[in-house]
Amino acid sequence: MTVVPRKGAVGIGTLIVFIAMVLVAAVAAAVLINTSGYLQQKASGTGRETTQEVASGIKVDRVVGYAPDITGDITRLAVYISPNAGSSGIDLNKVRVILSNGQKEVSLKYNYVYNATSSTQTYVALPQGNIFNDIVLGVNGTSENAASTQVNFNWSLLTGSTFGLIVLQDADGSVKASTPTLNQGDLVIIAIDVDAALGGIPPRTSITGEVIPEQGAPGVIEFTTPSTYTAHVMELQ
């Protein structure tokens, strides 16, 4: 009986299995490398977004109210805002202000209005004198069309769902009338007609609210008005 040698066949089979294992390992390694790279990029992107979300936002520095008659209600509100430290530019066109007196809650947005007849608008830079005057003297200091045109702020152009902007500090000219962007170092007043929005704010009234940017932490509004009004202009927060 003739015996056929099988050692060569076994050796070739083992080599084929080994090569197959190497190829599978190489493919698996490539998949792992690609996956880890993708996950690393996603993690980096998420980290940047989280950092921006935490660092960005609006800070409410103070809130001042105005009562034309000290025996009546507060009719106008000035909310002083600035960006949080490390915040990127904030588009004030996308900002919403929420106000509540416990019985009514309103949402307000910036609406740039220009009245050609009276040369007044809902925006002014470098205000002169009392910011609560019916007409606030100032300039269109960051206008795209005129660097220092005399254009005044008109409180009567505000409604119960809109607010205006009074720019106090804006070194880089980013807070423009139609495209206002709040950057580091800027200080802006959000002007609110609370008579139109909430029907006025009487004494002993608790007001809560937020200044909500498109991205980042909101600024908090929270105060209680005095039991009696002894001055026309009063600091509330």
Curated annotation (Swiss-Prot):
Keywords attached to this Swiss-Prot or TrEMBL record, sorted alphabetically, are:
Archaeal flagellum
Stored InterPro entries: Flagellin/pilin_N_arc, Flagellin_arc
* Ranges in coiled-coil conformation: none
Q: Please provide the Gene Ontology terms (biological process) for this protein.
A: archaeal or bacterial-type flagellum-dependent cell motility
Q: Where in the cell is it found?
A: Archaeal flagellum
GO CC list:
archaeal-type flagellum
Function, in words: Flagellin is the subunit protein which polymerizes to form the filaments of archaeal flagella.
Which PANTHER family does the entry link to?
FLAGELLIN B1
Q: Which family does it belong to?
A: Belongs to the archaeal flagellin family.
- Name this protein carries in UniProt: Probable flagellin PH0546
- What organism does the UniProt record list as the source? Pyrococcus horikoshii (strain ATCC 700860 / DSM 12428 / JCM 9974 / NBRC 100139 / OT-3)
